[in-house]
């Protein structure tokens, strides 16, 4: 009787471990991301990280997936503190802010011209003023217009302008 209960308990434990939604992951393969820049040009979305990783795609989700595939490890998009949307002709802005890989607290900025994610990271870490992803999600759902702060400058010399 004790053996059958023990065997049943072991079988239940093994099944729970095999079918558990939690999977182990090698933390050394995670690539930290502080800043993400996304731009739309010539019909293609381009995502760049502060570490120099790039991804391209027909929509934001495809560009993020391409960046993940081409990276030497697993980019930790959820650790990004800043997201810069370059160029004003992005049609899929609402699709972008609802990507599950983005942390709700990530601050969003816009830029009239493409900026280098690596260059702008130190500046934004000192001068945080963006609108959070969660605030933008709420605005998209309610139809509220939100002005994003604009990053202006280049080559390590940046400033934050009032949103438009």
Region locations from a protein language model:
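Membrane-proximal alpha-helical signals and transmembrane carboxylates
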Residues: 1-164
């Amino acid at each position: 009787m004790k053996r059958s209960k023990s065997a049943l308990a072991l079988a239940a434990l093994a099944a729970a471990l095999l079918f558990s939604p939690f999977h182990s992951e090698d933390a050394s393969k995670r690539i930290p991301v502080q800043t993400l820049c996304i731009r739309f040009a010539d019909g293609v979305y381009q995502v760049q990280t502060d570490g120099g990783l790039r991804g391209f795609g027909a929509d934001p989700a495809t560009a993020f997936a391409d960046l993940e595939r081409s990276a030497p490890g697993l980019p930790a998009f959820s650790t990004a503190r800043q997201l810069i949307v370059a160029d004003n002709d992005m049609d899929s802005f609402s699709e972008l802010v609802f990507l599950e890989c983005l942390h709700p607290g990530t601050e969003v900025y816009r830029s009239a011209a493409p900026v280098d994610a690596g260059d702008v990271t130190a500046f934004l870490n000192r001068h945080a003023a963006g609108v959070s992803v969660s605030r933008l999600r709420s605005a998209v759902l309610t139809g509220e217009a939100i002005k994003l702060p604009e990053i202006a400058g280049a080559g390590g010399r940046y400033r934050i302008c009032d949103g438009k």
